[in-house]
Amino acid sequence: MNEGEQLHLDQLFEKLLKARKIFKNKEVLRHSYTPKDLPHRHEQIETLAQILVPVLKGETPSNIFVYGKTGTGKTVTVKFVTEELKKVSHKYNIPVDVIYINCEIVDTHYRVLANIVNHFKHETGIEVPLVGWPTDEVYAKLKQVIDMRERFVIIVLDEIDKLVKKSGDEVLYSLTRINTELKRAKVSVIGISNDLKFKEYLDPRVLSSLSEEEVVFPPYDANQLRDILMQRAEEAFYPGVLDDGVIPLCAALAAREHGDARKALDLLRVAGEIAEREGASKVTEKHVWKAQEKIEQDMMEEVIKTLPLQSKVLLYAIVLLDENGELPANTGEVYSVYRDLCEYLDLEPLTQRRISDLINELDMLGIINAKVVSKGRYGRTKEIRLNVTPYKIRNVFRYDYTIQPLLAISLKDSQRRLV
């Protein structure tokens, strides 16, 4: 960078600093933020408090299962109530530890137990590696560290349905029977699930040891979402920077998707960020629509990024057909290119029937459109089109070493390999 470029960059930062500020505290709009009040969740707060109040009397509370779709306030409400419980218990000299575990990340029996042990490492000096020990040994350490003194331990397992679907229900069995093996401490579990049918995945022996109470969180409606956004906006934005239509529009768009407060907060935050980057003095409805487009684009990129390898190869076959002007294509045509690409990668191809299933999955995810059409006496077939531009898909695959080798080849290259 030469001196002129350095000066220009300095001036750019100065200019950006002097621009009218939009955000007073952007963190208020993050999912991780716990507000001082939770509008339209007072009933659920009271129910959780009633279930947990035995702690303050020295009694073990029931285990709790919290249900509701994404963005219905489950996690923030549980965090709010358990934080308040800790404050009150401190006043009464009752030791309470709350351990929050996100089971989308900590997704095995071993890792959940290790996380609980390591929560106490500053107190006990005991730390378990995240892999490598026998699970029974980790469980023994868990009992040892928890039972070092009298206390209540509340273990919050967020997205517990994902843990059970991936790794089974052994962790729940371990934690729900642990109280029979402890002498000083008492343990209670709060499971948070997006899946209302979650308990159908549990073994009868786990169900019998749970003795749980259930709290259901219904979706928010547009008016409730508006109240939530109004409350957060007061702390998040400087006065007068939001146009009157911004919050109602964010609320209405999020209400379409089962009343998702997370989506509403994301829309408001991203709209503010776009306005800030544009140097606008106000956040307008135009910025909300741009935010909606950006969030959908980011979500689609994330979906593509996390596809299994076989689905990525299949998707790239469809990209090549599109770039060659050969869409819509049928399943057989797509399968032919997919098989060539598998050979290029030295990858065992799946059967055409299995690829037909993967095409349906890509269709359900919204990445492609696979419409069944009638060909008269030739029967019915799928017409496959892309819903995402080849450029965007290539851009995601650029950073994926498993699929990268394919990016340099064209449709003709892939077909030539078999000649």
Swiss-Prot record:
Gene Ontology MF term list: ATP binding; ATP hydrolysis activity
Superkingdom assignment: Archaea
Entry's Gene Ontology BP terms: DNA replication
Binding, ATP: T72, G73, K74, T75, V76, Y220, R232
SUPFAM superfamilies named in the record: P-loop containing nucleoside triphosphate hydrolases, Winged helix' DNA-binding domain
Keyword ATP-binding: yes
Keyword check for ATP-binding: yes
Gene3D superfamilies assigned to the protein according to its UniProt record, in alphabetical order: 1.10.8.60, P-loop containing nucleotide triphosphate hydrolases, Winged helix-like DNA-binding domain superfamily/Winged helix DNA-binding domain
Alphabetic keyword roster: ATP-binding, DNA replication, Nucleotide-binding
InterPro entries: AAA+_ATPase (IPR003593), AAA_22 (IPR049945), Cdc6_C (IPR015163), Cdc6_lid (IPR055237), ORC1/CDC6 (IPR050311), Orc1/Cdc6_arc (IPR014277), P-loop_NTPase (IPR027417), WH-like_DNA-bd_sf (IPR036388)
HAMAP family: ORC1_type_DNA_replic_protein (MF_01407)
Job description of the protein: Involved in regulation of DNA replication.
Family: Belongs to the CDC6/cdc18 family.
Protein's name in the database: ORC1-type DNA replication protein
Organism: Pyrococcus horikoshii (strain ATCC 700860 / DSM 12428 / JCM 9974 / NBRC 100139 / OT-3)
